[in-house]
Amino acid sequence: MIHEDDLCIDGEVDSTDLPSGSGAGQRAYFCIKCGVYIYCKYKIAEPEKRIALRTKTLNDHNRFLPEAHIFVKDKDPWINLAGFKNCFDTMYDREKVWPEKSIKRLKEKIC
C-alpha cells in the first residue's frame, strides 16, 4: 500500500470496477497498451487515498518483498506459503501487522 500522491506513472492507464473481499468494491487500473494491472483503489480506503500497487510493475521490483498475504483461504492449491508468517484467511488489522514506520508514514499522509 502506498499513498496515491506518491505514485507517478509513465504512460496512460484505464480502469474498471471490480468486486473486493470487503464487499465495498475496488477500481483496478491497468496499462492501455499491454493490459497489465498496475494498481487498485479500494473504495473503503478512498478517504485515506491509499492504493494497492503491484510491485512487480516497478522497475526495481526486487526491492519489495511481501509483508503479508491476504485472502489465502481462496488461494490456488499450488501456491506454497510455507515459511511466511503473515498469512491471513481474510483481511488483517494493519495496526498489528504493518511495520511501525509504515503506519507512521501513512498517518502523516492522511492527517
Cite the ranges covered by each PLM segment.
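A short Gly-Trp-Pro
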Residues: 1-111
